[in-house]
Amino acid sequence: IMSISSLTHLVTHDKINIDSRWSKLKKLKRLLIIIIVTAFLYFYYNEETTNLLKKIFPDSYSTDVTEVGEDKGSYIIINNNEPDFNDEDKTTDSFEKYSKLDFLGRAGVAYANISKELMPTTERESIGMIKPTGWHTIKYDIVPGKYLYNRCHLIGYQLTGENRNELNLITCTRQMNTVGMLQWESMVSNYIKETNNNVLYRVTPKYEGNNLLASGVQIEAYSIQDNGKGVKFNIFVKNIQDGIEIDYKTGDSKLIENNN
């Protein structure tokens, strides 16, 4: 006959085993809940989740396109061409600031006080290893140079010499790069070289919702020493390519069929 002490020991041992198993089950349950919630947020995040992420990453989340003005074809004039810079930044102290990539890996605002000292003195190196969000390597015969997409520097290399920096690169069309942005970058570059003055320069990629490809970029510029008389503009450059239909959510594209 089992003694009372042996019986007590057996009951205690069984209780410990049950408690241990129950503890493991509770941990497993908590882990499953975490996995389910995380998966839900990752695959099905809605507008409320996006708004929350905007609050968490206010300095790096690129805003939607909300302002429109006079349409000039490759670009749109914003706010009567008046940029919106803080007075405290209107100094002759050069700087560069780049936003962190947001929760989708997209580049955000790039901001600089550009002077001759920031400009490059060497040739630009290859940036082919960098693939910004929405990137696809695809060719069309109707696109000059064939390739639809370029790696666009938000602040052009000729202005600050910033090259292999993923915080300063987005996926843009050939048309946006060479027709849309280049003329404004060259205007600023030529002005600085001729006057040795400073120019405040800010480029803001505009994404609609959770699109991986920017709809375009807002570019603002203001020359410091002459209070904007030399350079002053506020424009939106469209990320488009004539004859090509683009899915800005993914970066996919297709040739527009000729209806004629």
For every predicted segment, state its role:
Residues L31-Y45:
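Hydrophobic membrane-insertion alpha-helices, especially the h-region
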